[in-house]
Amino acid sequence: YIIIGGGCAGLSLAYELEIHNKLKNKTLAIIEPRLEYKKDKTWSFWKTTDHNFGDCIKKSWQNFSINIPNKTNYLECINYPYQSIDSGLYYEKINGKLNQNKNVSFFKNLKEINSNNSFIFNSVPSIKKDYDNLWQHFCGVEIETQNDFFDDEIFNIMDFDCEQRESVHFFYTL
């Protein structure tokens, strides 16, 4: 097997192949340009089904809020909690498991792949230059306060009570 892209999707696939014994008597090449895996992001999502990464969850919420100018709406999400996974814990778990299999290898800066007798998974998105793409960007900052300022039992998914500057802006507070 060959997995192009060793980010969240590629590593998740490799992990599932490994824990379900699909790599027995097989080789797996993961092509990823990064030099090292370290905490570089947080993945957050609504938990709609069980997953294998409960031990990587940094925080889980069953309550959230949405702010608009002069109003805050509070909602519950008991059946579908919102979870945040720490990428450092995720990388440590997956790479720890994959490194136990001598038939799994990571490669960087490959210019060419011999795909004979290989099944290739490409997790790198192709972006068409002639197509109008819609992007959603998040810039994250972790802050610490001397006093309790945030209620850690509720997260604010969208706070629109800020300058909009002719486009949509909001704060997202976990």
Predicted regions: what they are:
Residues 6, 16, 20, 97-174:
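Predominantly flavin-linked oxidoreductase catalytic cores and closely associated redox partners
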Residues 1-9, 29-31:
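Beta1/beta-strand and adjacent pyrophosphate-binding region of the FAD-binding site
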Residues 12-71, 88-89, 139, 143:
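N-terminal FAD cofactor-binding segment of flavoenzymes
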